[in-house]
Curated annotation (Swiss-Prot):
<dbReference type="GO" id="GO:0050385">
    <property type="term" value="F:ureidoglycolate lyase activity"/>
</dbReference>
<dbReference type="InterPro" id="IPR024060">
    <property type="entry name" value="Ureidoglycolate_lyase_dom_sf"/>
</dbReference>
<dbReference type="InterPro" id="IPR007247">
    <property type="entry name" value="Ureidogly_lyase"/>
</dbReference>
<comment type="subunit">
    <text>Homodimer.</text>
</comment>
<dbReference type="InterPro" id="IPR023525">
    <property type="entry name" value="Ureidogly_lyase_bac"/>
</dbReference>
<comment type="similarity">
    <text>Belongs to the ureidoglycolate lyase family.</text>
</comment>
<dbReference type="GO" id="GO:0000256">
    <property type="term" value="P:allantoin catabolic process"/>
</dbReference>
<keyword id="KW-0659">Purine metabolism</keyword>
<comment type="pathway">
    <text>Nitrogen metabolism; (S)-allantoin degradation.</text>
</comment>
<dbReference type="GO" id="GO:0006145">
    <property type="term" value="P:purine nucleobase catabolic process"/>
</dbReference>
<dbReference type="GO" id="GO:0004848">
    <property type="term" value="F:ureidoglycolate hydrolase activity"/>
</dbReference>
<protein>
    <recommendedName>
        <fullName>Ureidoglycolate lyase</fullName>
        <ecNumber>4.3.2.3</ecNumber>
    </recommendedName>
</protein>
<dbReference type="InterPro" id="IPR047233">
    <property type="entry name" value="UAH_cupin"/>
</dbReference>
<comment type="function">
    <text>Catalyzes the catabolism of the allantoin degradation intermediate (S)-ureidoglycolate, generating urea and glyoxylate. Involved in the utilization of allantoin as nitrogen source.</text>
</comment>
<keyword id="KW-0456">Lyase</keyword>
<dbReference type="InterPro" id="IPR011051">
    <property type="entry name" value="RmlC_Cupin_sf"/>
</dbReference>
<dbReference type="Pfam" id="PF04115">
    <property type="entry name" value="Ureidogly_lyase"/>
</dbReference>
Amino acid sequence: MTDFLEIRPLTKEAFTPFGDVIETTPSSMRHINGGQTERHHALSAPEAAGEGARIILNIFRGQPRVFPHKIDMMERHPLGSQSFSPLSGRPFLVVVAQDDGGRPARPQVFLARGDQGVNYRRNVWHYPLMPLQAVSDFLVADREGPGNNLEEYFFDEPFMIAEPSL
C-alpha cells in the first residue's frame, strides 16, 4: 500500500522542532541607514561546529520535482545547520523528520511560500531541495570545514508526496 504524506503550510510554530522559518514580520523589522532601509534582524542563527569550521553562502539551482514524488531517503548534517532562502520567489516543499533512535521518523511535509526560507538545525533529518514549477535558485548558508557533515538514511519502504495544490 502506498503511504502518501500530508502537505501542510509552513508556519513558525509547526516548524519549531526542526529549525527556523526565515520570513519577515513586523516584529523583526527596524529602520537603519537614516530610515532608508528596513532591516529584519536575527531571523535565524546558522551553526558551524568543530575546529576550523565556518559559515559560507552558496547559491543552489534546483530542478523542479515531478509528482507523485517518492521519498526514499533523508539526510542530516551533524556539524552544522543549513538554510535555504528562495531567490526565485517560487514555493517549494520542505520535508523533515524527528530523530527516532538514529534514523528518521515518519517524514512531515511543509509547503513554503516563495517569500519563506528555512534553517534546518544541526542533526535534523531532511530531504534534499524540492523546488516546484520551474528551475529555482536558493541562497544557502552552510557549514564548511573538516569532518564528516553528512549522514544519509534510506527507507526500506518509500513514502510518497502527491502534487501540491498551489
